[in-house]
Amino acid sequence: MTQEMQSLALVPQGSIEAYIRAANSYPMLTAEEEKELAERLHYEGDLEAAKTLILSHLRFVIHVARSYSGYGLPQADLIQEGNIGLMKAVRHFNPEVGVRLVSFAVHWIKAEIHEYVLRNWRIVKVATTKSQRKLFFNLRKNKKRLGWFNQDEVELVAKELGVSESDVREMESRMSAQDMAFDMSADDSDDPHPVAPVLFLEDKSSDFADGIEEDNWDNHAADRLTLAIKTLDERSQDIIRARWLEDDNKSTLQELADKYGVSAERVRQLEKNAMKKLRLAIED
């Protein structure tokens, strides 16, 4: 992969608007042009052909990434993950199958973005089972109005997605509580140590004792997280704090790359490795 392709395709640099303009400046391919390039890559390993295929489809990744903007994650990161999926799709694309690259790539693009959202959305892993994943990514577009579903809507969504009505109600509750769970502060209550609602969103069958146990686990996990961060090297600690622990003005990969004099892809790798270590520390 060339330096130009890696720097543009993997990580939006500068403003999102400038990146979108650059991505849209690459011409779209005709079916004939696409097939010729795909054959050159597939049979000859032509990396210049791969570059052209990727750059001509960046606008499509932007289009897909925009549909995930409601989850509160940085648009640049969503695009970056989608671009990784696009690159994987180009590498696996067989020009003899008889479909356009865009039809083949959409599944790879969405898969990368899905995993990113599931790992990071609002910290809470609201989607842990197969049925919950399906609900997580379809519930928003199935809502016909603001507010809670009525019974007819619950039945319709459950039927469309092939899940139970109780699953629909549970996921709706979790998603509707996303802001409330993390925005509560001590000023919101006379209690100097208010219990955030997130502690009671895990399971509708939970009783109060379960909530207290969950509260204790969260405190334990927070302590383990603090200790785990201290085990990281100084650069990795800075990356995690700048990317995840700052309330405002979270740093982009490119900003951190400029700070440390490395590529944005290298920062992404360091972040990924650090996050893996932190997750393992919390789950132990």
Curated annotation (Swiss-Prot):
A motif (Interaction with polymerase core subunit RpoC) lies at residues 77-80. Keywords: Cytoplasm, DNA-binding, Sigma factor, Stress response, Transcription, Transcription regulation. One of its GO terms (molecular function) is sigma factor activity. It holds the Pfam family Sigma70_r2. One of its GO terms (biological process) is DNA-templated transcription initiation. One of its GO terms (cellular component) is cytoplasm. InterPro entries: RNA_pol_sigma-70_dom, RNA_pol_sigma70, RNA_pol_sigma70_r1_2, RNA_pol_sigma70_r2, RNA_pol_sigma70_r4, RNA_pol_sigma_r2, RNA_pol_sigma_r3/r4-like, RNA_pol_sigma_RpoH_proteobac. Residues 253-272 bind DNA. Residues 53-122 are annotated as: Sigma-70 factor domain-2. Gene3D superfamilies: 1.20.120.1810, Winged helix-like DNA-binding domain superfamily/Winged helix DNA-binding domain. Residues 228-280 are annotated as: Sigma-70 factor domain-4. It is found in: Cytoplasm. Belongs to the sigma-70 factor family. RpoH subfamily. Interacts with the RNA polymerase core enzyme. Sigma factors are initiation factors that promote the attachment of RNA polymerase to specific initiation sites and are then released. This sigma factor is involved in regulation of expression of heat shock genes. This is RNA polymerase sigma factor RpoH. It comes from Proteus mirabilis. The lineage of its organism: Bacteria, Pseudomonadati, Pseudomonadota, Gammaproteobacteria, Enterobacterales.
